[in-house]
Amino acid sequence: MKKRAGIWAALLLAAVMLAGCGNPADQKDSKAKQKTEVFPVTIDDASNQDVTIKKEPKKIVSLMPSNTEITYALGLGDKVVGVTTNDTYPKEVKKVEKVGDMNVNVEKVISLKPDLVLAHESSMSASADAIKQLKDAGITVLTVNDAQSFSEVYKSIEMIGEAGGAEKKADQLVKSMKSDLKDIQEKAKTISKDEEKSVFIEVSPDPDIYTTGKDTFMNEMLNVIHAKNAAADQTGWVQMTDEAIVKLNPDAIVTTDGVKAKAVEKRDGWSEINAVKHHRVYDVDPDLVTRSGPRLIEGVEELAESIYPDTFKE
């Protein structure tokens, strides 16, 4: 009996080991099957359309830099076959086919034979005809939301993740961004009310100067670092005159339009502004603070280090 029991134990152990090793080909097929089972997916996009993506996209065209950055951050960059001429990040996009700027080259997009086109809510009106032509050509178009807050940026990431079969990576990215943002908020808590600075954000240069008011992610970025938006009484993206800006008299000025600090300080009438008097005019990387994508937290850090160097610069 003991001998027979020993034989059965040996056979059982061998079976377990074989099951554990498995066939590599079978394991690969199993993983592919699991991914296939995710699709089709139906997503309620920013155009209020239920967009069904029947299978995992192999070719993706992005019509907005923020969409592109998200797609690459989710590990889907090898599937991107078309981007706009406005795309600058990551560096790999330089070699990707260009499909126009805000005006979509429909023929070019169709020639790339994409499984999925990532459009954007902010350009819905301008590209309405182009989007219709793409849909008429049988191409799946998903319109990503125009994010104006961190929570909406997270939604954009999750939407693209679901569309591309990268939901897990999207969840990980969102968690990482939230964690990094929390770290910044903790540092900002050390800034007292008396130390808080009013900040004017210039997103478009003179003669047509635009700034950011409330209900924008840039306003939220300032709130996170305990800075006061000098134009907080405005809503959205608004144009302001030189006289109005001088009257606001901000403690700091941040340009996101490529204009250098010295050029701002030389503007007529601006010498009376506190920010200019005390040389607190900063130019930051526009792509970090104006693109509603995965690098937005880096933008918050750059703003914080510029406005409160003693608190945030290590």
Swiss-Prot record:
**Coiled-coil ranges per UniProt:** none
Q: Where is the lipid attached (S-diacylglycerol cysteine)?
A: 21
Q: Where is this chain's protein located in or outside the cell?
A: Cell membrane
Residue intervals of the Fe/B12 periplasmic-binding domain: 59-311
Q: Describe the task this protein carries out.
A: Probably part of an ABC transporter complex.
Q: Which GO terms describe its cellular component?
A: plasma membrane
Summarize the subunit comment. The complex is composed of two ATP-binding proteins (YvrA), two transmembrane proteins (YvrB) and a solute-binding protein (YvrC).
Give a yes or no for keyword Signal in this entry.
yes
Query: Where is the signal peptide, in residue numbers?
Result: 1-20
Gene3D superfamilies named in the record: Nitrogenase molybdenum iron protein domain (3.40.50.1980)
In its UniProt entry, the species of origin is given as: Bacillus subtilis (strain 168)
Any idea what this protein is called?
A: Uncharacterized ABC transporter substrate-binding lipoprotein YvrC
Keywords of this protein's UniProt record, alphabetized?
Cell membrane, Lipoprotein, Membrane, Palmitate, Signal
Gene name, per UniProt, is yvrC
Q: How does it sit in the membrane?
A: Lipid-anchor
Task: Choose any GO biological process term that the UniProt entry carries and state it.
Answer: cellular response to iron ion
Keyword Signal, does the record have it? yes
Q: Where is the lipid attached (N-palmitoyl cysteine)?
A: 21
Q: Which family does it belong to?
A: Belongs to the bacterial solute-binding protein 8 family.
